[in-house]
Amino acid sequence: MLHQLTLAEIARALADKQFSAEELTRTLLGRIRQLDPQLNSFISITDDLAIAQAKAADERRANGENGALLGAPIAHKDLFCTQGVRTSCGSKMLDNFVSPYDATVVEKLAAAGAVTLGKLNMDEFAMGSSNQSSHYGAVNNPWSLDRVPGGSSGGSAAAVAARLLPAATGTDTGGSIRQPAALTNLTGIKPTYGRVSRWGMIAYASSLDQGGPLARTAEDCALMLGVMAGFDPKDSTSVEQPVDDYLAALQKPLSGLRIGLPREYFGAGLDSRIADAVLAVVEELKTLGATVKDISLPNMQHAIPAYYVIAPAEASSNLSRFDGVRYGYRCDAPQNLEDLYKRSRAEGFGSEVKNRIMVGTYALSAGYYDAYYLQAQKIRRLIKNDFVSAFAEVDVILGPTTPNPAWKIGEKNDDPVSQYLEDIYTITANLAGLPGLSMPAGFVDGLPVGVQLLAPYFQEGRLLNVAHQYQQVSDWHTRTPAGF
């Protein structure tokens, strides 16, 4: 079945001429039309663009090209600007915005021959952990349709998990690639801050946002990241550092790898069954030659309050550009300029976005800047220092990706703090700018569990290596949700 193939398998099959990129694209577009109404993972399906790109890929292959992503079907989280295609950011504010250019990530993947099947659902402006804040409706988890797929890259996760496509792009500001990957049985990697260009990626929190891939395997993530990563002069936060050969790194044996287990990851709030699954992964990695030691990240307890000052503060600034004047939603018959601003923003933004803008504006206001924003930045520095100390002793930090499996849609709506706490293990990597990966590690009551790996700056290859070696001796990542 074509839809069951991974990116790596697709590359080999296309090279062997077992089928064409156009055949594969048409098959998956039909599958999306048939199955996505159960999931709501797509905001836009780009049939014409996809067929045109697939035909072009087949032509390039006929002329002797043989790239790993040439003809590979993917889709983009709907905050990556895509020329000539609606780029909504999951918001009424940008419901009618058609991007005049491609984001660097979109451009790079298209140049490599990837085929864009559409734009994927997401929490509005990437603000959420459950994909319930989207203007286009909640996304359903294919493992249990009444549960959330995680967020904010929930559409990306649900679509790949349901085998609608082999891989997708996502973004991660506080866990928005890793957390949905964990809740849907995928592999997802957040690269080091500055590793992947943010040009054309609509901003939530500029010092935290980072793009990356979600796929079924570490090998597929390596294929995607190898194309997505690299310096971009159009992005002032992009780092001019050579991109490692992530595929070559996959094969390295794990003998001598030093794994750190932070004791703070295994305290109150963690589902004991998830803890058991994580420790089972640790035992498997030990048989592959890794050594394990306990470590401490003492300032982790402050991560969520610090994040929920810094991220909303940056969001309140970034989202000030959406005012009804240049582009985006504009209210009807404004009485004056103030009315235009007020009603365009009140009607165009959803409640979660407005909440975070208010929190951020408050934290930046004259009387509270020192008390909140500066204190949060100091905590950020302490968290970064904790990781520097830890990585002096270990090569990789391992723990759960999330404290709980996927919860029911609507279950935590009246308690936003409990939803924020689902990112307790992922947020620290964003605050410190570190690379992080989540990989499948088992199931609890039929719901997927993820293990998170963190590494020093620009060591994405090490994370992919550990995940790939684990996936050679486990089969969690091969499991498919019933009905898909």
Swiss-Prot record:
User: A single GO BP annotation from the record?
Assistant: translation
Q: What is its EC number?
A: 6.3.5.7
Q: Which GO molecular function terms does the record list?
A: ATP binding; glutaminyl-tRNA synthase (glutamine-hydrolyzing) activity
Q: Name one Pfam family in it.
A: Amidase
Q: Which domain of life is it from?
A: Bacteria
Q: Which Gene3D superfamilies match?
A: Amidase signature (AS) domain
Q: Which GO terms describe its cellular component?
A: glutamyl-tRNA(Gln) amidotransferase complex
The active site lies at K77, S152, S176
Asked whether the UniProt record includes Calcium among its keywords, one would answer no
**Tagged with keyword ATP-binding:** yes
Write down the chemical reaction(s) this protein catalyses.
L-glutamyl-tRNA(Gln) + L-glutamine + ATP + H2O = L-glutaminyl-tRNA(Gln) + L-glutamate + ADP + phosphate + H(+)
Q: Which terms are listed as keywords in the entry?
A: ATP-binding, Ligase, Nucleotide-binding, Protein biosynthesis
| Subunit-level organization | Heterotrimer of A, B and C subunits.
By sequence similarity, the record places it as follows: Belongs to the amidase family. GatA subfamily.
State what this protein does: Allows the formation of correctly charged Gln-tRNA(Gln) through the transamidation of misacylated Glu-tRNA(Gln) in organisms which lack glutaminyl-tRNA synthetase. The reaction takes place in the presence of glutamine and ATP through an activated gamma-phospho-Glu-tRNA(Gln).
Please give the name of this protein: Glutamyl-tRNA(Gln) amidotransferase subunit A
